[in-house]
From Swiss-Prot:
Any one GO MF annotation of this record: ribosome binding
Domain PPIase FKBP-type: 168-254
Protein name according to UniProt: Trigger factor
Reactions the enzyme catalyzes: [protein]-peptidylproline (omega=180) = [protein]-peptidylproline (omega=0)
Cross-referenced NCBIfam families: tig
Keyword Zinc-finger in record: no
EC id: 5.2.1.8
Its biological purpose: Involved in protein export. Acts as a chaperone by maintaining the newly synthesized protein in an open conformation. Functions as a peptidyl-prolyl cis-trans isomerase.
Keyword Oxidoreductase: no
CC per GO annotation: cytoplasm
Entry keywords, A to Z: Cell cycle, Cell division, Chaperone, Cytoplasm, Isomerase, Rotamase
Compartment annotation: Cytoplasm
Length: 443
């Protein structure tokens, strides 16, 4: 086929969508169809005829519909890919093909609509005015982290004194819930073990057990949150729970002294432990500060650069987010049928966030291209080594276990950080005092 005889017109439907219109001369269609029939002739089995010797009219009698479908498929596929190459179109979605089939002695017309990445000329990323929190570690934060470590080595002991329940206690309870006049099975539990203050239950449930004693039968009234994901059928509704308090335990913590340090091989003294805690907190603050700075930069960039996000990218991101959310719920032991019910509303819920993620990625990519920022092989290798160290794995095993998509994600993470660092290096950055936290918040 002489491709130059095929007329191709490109229409821009939107900044992220193009429509390719093809007009294929009848002679080219006929030639393609003849080729299809010749191929059929070599392989077709029709009673009374030898393979390769079947007359064309007999083939048409048996295979006309199939031959025309094959002709259309062959023409569309080849011409579509040739047109993308010729017009330098980088499609990011499967084409939406529109065609009416072949008509004898008539040119064959079809169209292919595809999504493309928007052409972005990034603005406003140079000379930004930004604020950054100082990276300091307070004694309250160190004390809070040490308290967390003590709790890891605490032991649960039954409370024998006649006292009220307080925050941090562990209770064993039976409960049943009533909503809309019903007493559903999923709102009943026996011997349920609960840490008061863990926020495991619906907001307000645990607070209403404070001050109560073992043996009490307590009526608790709550309102399910409007965005309650575990069961959307009860979201926003009033409910009453009948709770029987059966047992009370408290966690006894070890003294924070030199003897406590013997629980760890890597520390020789309490001061060593405190210093390591301080370093860990500093790294936590550093990561948080970088994340906060990246968000500030991204907020400004998105405000100054308005463009459409390709729907195929957004849908792909929504799908990924839904799968991750589903995995998290599966690990909680939630019934799959309940997960299906809950996830019905996730698509709309995640759409705005997914759109932001897609637009952010495209915008950072455009800045990287404009400023010739890329990821070197050395940077990629070093990041893989960091991942191996983080998970205490052999570097070669980590490297071999990463498929191409995973490697691309690592490269994108490195590239995004380099772009953020570049923007920050060109910005006017003022340091602000770190917001003070209480010991409870630090904990």
């Amino acid at each position: 086929m002489d491709e130059n005889t095929v007329a191709v017109k490109v229409e821009e439907i939107s900044p992220v969508k193009k429509k390719l219109l093809f007009d294929v001369p009848w002679e080219d269609v006929k030639r393609e169809r003849d080729t299809i029939y010749r191929n059929f002739s070599r392989t077709a089995k029709i009673k009374g005829f030898r393979k390769g010797k079947i007359p064309r009219k007999i083939l048409e009698l048996h295979y006309k519909k199939h031959a025309e479908e094959e002709t259309v498929s062959s023409l569309v596929s080849r011409l579509y890919w040739d047109a993308l190459k010729e017009h330098d179109i980088r499609a990011i979605s499967q084409p939406e093909i529109e065609q009416q089939g072949i008509e004898e002695e008539k040119d064959f017309s079809f169209s292919a609509t595809v999504e493309v990445e928007p052409q972005i000329d990034p603005q406003g990323y140079l000379d930004m005015t930004l604020s950054k929190e100082e990276q300091t570690v307070t004694e309250d934060e160190v004390d809070g982290r040490l308290e967390d470590i003590r709790k890891m080595f605490g032991t649960l002991e039954e409370v024998t004194e006649d006292r009220e329940i307080r925050k941090g206690d562990f209770v064993t309870i039976d409960f049943e819930g009533f909503i809309d006049g019903q007493n559903p099975e999923e709102m009943k539990r026996n011997d349920y073990f609960l840490e008061i203050g863990s926020n495991t239950m619906v907001p307000g449930f645990e607070d209403q057990l404070l001050g109560e004693k073992v043996g009490t039968i307590k009526e608790i009234k709550i309102i399910f949150p409007e965005n309650y994901q575990i069961n959307s059928n009860v979201a926003g509704k009033d409910a009453t729970f009948k709770v029987t308090i059966k047992n009370l335990k408290e966690k006894k913590l070890p003294e924070l002294d030199e003897n406590f340090v013997k629980n760890f091989d890597k520390y020789e003294s309490l001061d060593d432990l405190k210093e390591d805690v301080r370093k860990s907190l500093f790294e936590d603050h550093k990561r948080k500060t970088e994340a906060d700075m990246s968000k500030k930069i991204m907020d400004k960039l998105l405000e100054m650069n308005d463009f459409d996000a390709p729907s195929s990218y957004v849908e792909r991101q929504i799908f990924f987010m839904m799968m991750e959310a589903r995995k998290r719920l599966i690990t909680t032991g939630m019934d799959p049928a309940m997960i299906d019910q809950v996830s019905a509303s996730w698509h709309d819920k995640y759409k705005d966030e997914a759109t932001r993620i897609v637009k952010s990625s495209l915008l950072l990519k455009s800045i990287a291209q404009k400023e010739s920022i890329d990821v070197t092989d050395e940077e990629f290798e070093e990041r893989l080594r960091e991942i191996a160290r983080q998970y205490s794995q052999d570097y070669e095993k980590i490297k071999d276990s990463f498929n191409e998509d995973m490697k691309e994600n690592v490269r994108n993470d490195i590239l995004n950080k380099k772009v953020f660092d570049f923007i920050e290096s060109k910005a006017s950055v003022s340091m602000i005092e770190k917001e003070k936290t209480s010991p409870e918040e630090a904990n």
